[in-house]
Amino acid sequence: MPKPASQIDPAQAGVVADSPDEEYASRGGYKLAGALDILGEDAPVIKGKRCLDAGASTGGFTDVLLRRGAQSVIAVDVGYGQLRWSLQQDPRVEVHDRTNIRYLDPQEIGEPAQLIVGDLSFISLKLVIPALVRASTADAEYLLMVKPQFEIGREDLGAGGVVRDPADHFHTVLAVIAAAKENGLGLKQVAASPLPGPAGNVEYFVYLGRGAAMPPDEETRELVRCAIANGPAGQEKTEK
């Protein structure tokens, strides 16, 4: 069983291994970098990998991948022209704007991705995972950010669209992991994002592997519990 990831102090979340001289392209960059640092030695290898950024937007995740040695990044987003200009001009970045990742044709990206990261809004990861698998190599890895506010039913959302109940976090993360299992992926680790979303939503990274073993159910649940307890939601509960 993987050992639960340890949470870092959110105040130190901007202190990452690549020590950027300038800010990341978006706040999302600090979320991914923070999660990678939390995972530590258990984090996926980025250097030399062909990567795919699902929901690239302004390029926070793409930025982190490049700074940590990605060979190339396929930046996919349903919008247009959002990616930071410097990233658009980087020869290592392949821009696929106006592309709904759920319906991505693998032929559109050429060589499949070895590592896929994702920061998607207004859609459940459960609907997207099949497309991500089709766009990846047989031994690919995935580090996907679960946003409970887009996984839970609208009737369960709190004021301002914030999911505050850790029990809801637990069940939404487990549901994404179950969808991953149905698509041939195994769970490697779970970590809370050290930075909440703009409205205060706590988000979680699930680290998955294609063809990797899925831990027994209780071990999976324990990984999720530990991620919640060590993350902002657990800290908030402790402070009350």
Regions found by a protein language model. Give the residues of each.
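S4-like RNA-binding module at protein N-termini
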Residues: M1-D42
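Conserved class I S-adenosyl-L-methionine
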Residues: V45-S57
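Conserved S-adenosyl-L-methionine
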Residues: K49, V64-S72
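Glycine-rich SAM-binding Motif I of class I
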Residues: G59-G60, G81
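S-adenosyl-L-methionine
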Residues: S72-L127
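A short glycine-rich, Lys/Arg-flanked "PGG" loop and its adjoining helix->strand segment in the class I
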Residues: K126-L143
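Short, glycine-/aromatic-enriched active-site segment of Class I SAM-dependent methyltransferases
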Residues: P148-D165
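Flexible, glycine-/basic-rich loop-and-beta segments that form/coincide
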Residues: V202, L208-K240
